[in-house]
Amino acid sequence: MKPNYRNIVQKGDEIYLCVNGEWFFYNQTEPPLGAGAMGTVYLGRSCQTQERVAIKRVVDKYANVPSIRERAKLEASLLFRHRNLVEMIGYCELNPYNGPIFIVSRLVQGITLDEHVNTHLRNRKDAVKRICESLYPVMDALDYLHQKGIVHMDIKPANIMIEHGSNIRLMDLGIAYT
């Protein structure tokens, strides 16, 4: 994608992003879906289809570090399809050297493994067995990534999502590298 100043547009409280020719938006006054050391994730929508997506704004102090910026772009450009990974749509930046960078991905809904353990498995006799069983899909996703030469940099229970249909997805590659 060739950056230009029309890739990111602010209209009131809404931020509009052009990613691979498609426009997405989120309202920056809405509470975020989550936040971590590298960024904050907001609920967004496609302007064309109204499909709900996740939009991660990389924290400015990291977005302005060239090596981290390149890794964020790499993570967003990993257009893989695997049932146990979150599908990336792409990224958007104001300019290639500094300033905001956004990563857009398909929205995954459910609860994290952290939440699942604390809510449903605490004090159960079979808790360890159930946790281990939930890790098989994660290992399958990691094997897929490793076969492509990609290393996930932030594996933890908070980055493992159990969808409502019980599919398990590994999220937030932690600014992966190859």
Language model features with spans:
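Protein kinase glycine-rich loop
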Residues: 30-36, 41
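Conserved beta3-strand ATP-binding lysine motif
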Residues: 56-60
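Short beta-strand micro-motifs within the conserved protein kinase catalytic domain, predominantly
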Residues: 87-101
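Conserved short submotifs of the Hanks-type protein kinase catalytic core
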Residues: 98-112
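AlphaC helix of the protein kinase catalytic domain
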Residues: 113-125
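Activation segment signature within eukaryotic-like protein kinase domains
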Residues: 134-135
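Catalytic-loop of the protein kinase fold
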Residues: 146-162
